[in-house]
Amino acid sequence: MTDKAHQCVIIGIAGASASGKSLIASTLYRELREQVGDQHIGVIPEDGYYKDQSHLSMEERVKTNYDHPSAMDHNLLLEHLQSLKAGKPIELPLYSYTEHTRKKETVHLEPKKVIILEGILLLTDIRLRQEMNFSIFVDTPLDICLMRRMKRDVNERGRSMDSVMAQYQKTVRPMFLQFIEPSKQYADIIVPRGGKNRIAIDILKAKISQFFE
């Protein structure tokens, strides 16, 4: 491995949908970026690695179980993490929540000292876990996650309340219990109460800051 590979630190943040993962990731990114600069830290959302469904009709796309590991292109994510560790840039895929497939455009991402990786299914894949220097599970009660998800999907993603509730009952909750919650055992740190747990965020900041020394 190259010196660059030793310098790239991968931190995984997992948890239920609407548990506060993205808030913790964005807070850590924003506050650490102010300390070390944009060139040293980046964020990769797992959502961008939902499989491309542009070949499917909209009717078929909405039937996809987005909370099952098979919906993710973890092979591509693994390839990208390994590229960053090897000092190579990647083209970060983007996902459209309204079109239910990948966008045509990508975001160019250069290797960073620290990469924060966040998503619901990260800890279910042993290959991804092996690339992480340490991992976090955001442990938020499901009823709170549902309320947050309802508000987010209706206001930001153009969903109806009925469709959000139907999806929650059919796939979100069952897949959480089958895949996501059991993956909590692999986390090095468990954060209760979601993205507004300031004490936990400060502890995580202190831990991550060690990698910049």
Swiss-Prot record:
Q: Which reaction does it catalyse?
A: uridine + ATP = UMP + ADP + H(+); cytidine + ATP = CMP + ADP + H(+)
Keywords (alphabetical) are: ATP-binding, Cytoplasm, Kinase, Nucleotide-binding, Transferase
Record's subcellular location: Cytoplasm
Q: Does the keyword Zinc-finger apply?
A: no
Q: Give the metabolic or biological pathway.
A: Pyrimidine metabolism; CTP biosynthesis via salvage pathway; CTP from cytidine: step 1/3; Pyrimidine metabolism; UMP biosynthesis via salvage pathway; UMP from uridine: step 1/1
InterPro entries the UniProt entry points to: P-loop_NTPase, PRK/URK, Uridine_kinase, Uridine_kinase-like
Q: Which domain of life is it from?
A: Bacteria
One GO MF term: ATP binding
GO annotation, biological process: CTP salvage; UMP salvage
Q: Write down the Pfam families for this protein, in alphabetical order.
A: PRK
Per UniProt, ATP binds at G15, A16, S17, A18, S19, G20, K21, S22
- The primary site where this protein sits is cytoplasm
Q: Quote the NCBIfam families the UniProt record gives.
A: PRK05480.1, udk
What is the protein named? Answer: Uridine kinase
Organism listed in the record? Yersinia enterocolitica serotype O:8 / biotype 1B (strain NCTC 13174 / 8081)
